[in-house]
Amino acid sequence: MNPIINKKDLEASIEEVRKFAYTYLEKYSPSKQQLKIYLYKKFLKKNQKIFKKKELFNLIDVVISTLVEQNMINDKYYADSKTKSLIRRGYSLNKIRYSLIKKGIDEKYIRDSISKIKENESDPDFF
């Protein structure tokens, strides 16, 4: 039951996932995990082909890795901008940390962005 029989089908599937990614990136600036989940749902919705979950995630990972190499997705930038946005809305540092963890951001990026806020603000919890 392997739907990807030849190289043309594989390339067509990767190209379709890439198009979904580009259209999503035109509107939003997501984290890697957010984009991965979106692409998975979108591909399953648009395609009636039956893919194994692991194969589909491998296709998505290939597309995401090329987007990271092209600097179209950057979790460090995402963590910094999201932290600034949430601090302006009045979120506490713990709530910001939890929000970034939920978005799939690496812990070192979370620590870096929160430490930048702590350096810039006298008491970031009461901004």
Language-model features and meaning:
Residues 1-127:
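An alpha-helical, amphipathic repeat domain used for nucleic-acid recognition
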